[in-house]
């Protein structure tokens, strides 16, 4: 393989910039840049870096050499830590590009090489990508568990059970004259049933892992002037939505990203829902608001306390489900003990966005719903549609398995099940999917 390099840190001004080189020429590259020939693996050296072509000084840097296979990629690897200057990064990049047999790495190529050198499986590689992209504590927790091999361990345990079934069936096929106990087939049947139940239950997870990975969508809906935009601004801790007393001010969906209790929340402020608007643009905004609410994972339905009874309609209440928070806003403008009809049907939070009354209860309720929808369990979740696709296919083959049929055909169903699970971890030949997975990494990883 060619020797590759990339800047692993962000390009721009910083205290330190990190370059990574991987491949058979890594040590040669280090010698050319430093003029030094003796580098002990895993020791950091302070060295002057110069251009091999012009001999111009690039920087005073810290360098370290990792000898294969004891490196991230499993190849000879060199790391170069320079000052975080754009000029230095450009000069070092040009110097490396001018060394024969050395090229710039593609996105995710270092991690791809690590996978190909059996440093980890595909699920761990995807976990590393998720770890890099994690923005909240819960996303980090999920990603680091996956990067640590939790999914690999789970899928390999299923694969081992399938392999055992195959070995038992092939014993029957290859040695028909041998006295093989009937309990063997009973063992096969029990393991088969257990796997069907286990994988079926695992797939029936309400996509918790994928929700945590991508973020839970929260739509704020309700009639005009209920305080939806004010709530969005409060949750975002800045003004991103225009607030006015004019009905129909918000016409398109306004989106913001938030971390609540470690869960990634994608907030969507929508147009006020009312039935009497003659404004074509506002009507389109209302349609989008309803569509957004139907697709949302969590909903906040917000009413103005002064106009609540007249504002309640089926377009709004029809969107309320178990993951909906009903909020009555502007309670500072009504008698303290007033009870609304809607409270007889739904649990409501009474707040005042303007006067900061009971606002922490909104955050608490959002966090509780998010935890219920994407909270952690001991068993790692499916985090990727790719995994789900292969598991569904595996389950089809598993359900097709029937010992009453020809044993060779039955064994093939188990073999295909095992291949589908192997496609998730990369145990089988999966060259066609590697590019799709690793292209989502940043350059230098």
From Swiss-Prot:
UniProt key word Zinc-finger: no
SUPFAM superfamilies according to UniProt: P-loop containing nucleoside triphosphate hydrolases, TrmE connector domain
Cellular component terms per the entry's GO annotation: cytoplasm
Keyword set includes GTP-binding: yes
Gene3D superfamilies found in the cross-reference section: P-loop containing nucleotide triphosphate hydrolases, Probable tRNA modification gtpase trme, domain 1, tRNA modification GTPase MnmE domain 2
Annotated keywords: Cytoplasm, GTP-binding, Hydrolase, Magnesium, Metal-binding, Nucleotide-binding, Potassium, tRNA processing
Residue intervals of the TrmE-type G domain: 215-371
Positions contributing to K(+) binding: 225, 244, 246, 249
Binding site for Mg(2+): 229, 250
Positions of (6S)-5-formyl-5,6,7,8-tetrahydrofolate binding: 20, 79, 119, 445
GO molecular function, one term: GTPase activity
EC number(s) given by UniProt: 3.6.-.-
Record family assignment: Belongs to the TRAFAC class TrmE-Era-EngA-EngB-Septin-like GTPase superfamily. TrmE GTPase family.
Domain of life: Bacteria
InterPro entries found in the cross-reference section: G_TrmE, GTP-bd, GTP-bd_TrmE_N, GTPase_MnmE, MnmE_dom2, MnmE_helical, P-loop_NTPase, Small_GTP-bd
General function of this protein: Exhibits a very high intrinsic GTPase hydrolysis rate. Involved in the addition of a carboxymethylaminomethyl (cmnm) group at the wobble position (U34) of certain tRNAs, forming tRNA-cmnm(5)s(2)U34.
Transmembrane segments: none
Annotated protein name in UniProt: tRNA modification GTPase MnmE
